Amino acid sequence: MPLPAPEIGLVVSYEYLWKRQEQNQTPDKARPCCVIVLYIQSEKDDDPDGPDTIKAVYVPISHVPPDDAQEGFELSPHAKKVAGLDSERQWVVVSECNLDSWPTDIRPIHGKAGQFHYGYLPPGEFTKLKQAFLRFQQMRKLKIVRRL
């Protein structure tokens, strides 16, 4: 199965680098992450024939609740089902993110060779995620790991 097209709300298997691991520059594993922002960065200023690069902002989804230095919310059973995630309790962390080039560090889902995405967060859950994420950004408390 080929890589999916980049889309907002898409949940992919991505080698997320937690802010606390940033010095190591080595993610511990691929995990579900939701693409919350996409934009195109033009390289035309430096090279008129240069390519445009797609940049993505990923937020992590974890079976472990956010710790004291993080904030997030638990996904509803409906959201997990629609997004293609397992039925165990899962949280999306909204207080940190990775900024990376698409599709760098997207990996096949463990046990599903050739499959790179789980599904999509349903609109209601994505809106909740987006609002919480923007709140952290506006308060200037969002922790960004730039992986470019």
Region locations from a protein language model:
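Short, charged beta-turn/beta-strand-edge "cap" motif at the junction between a beta-strand
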Residues: L17-Q21
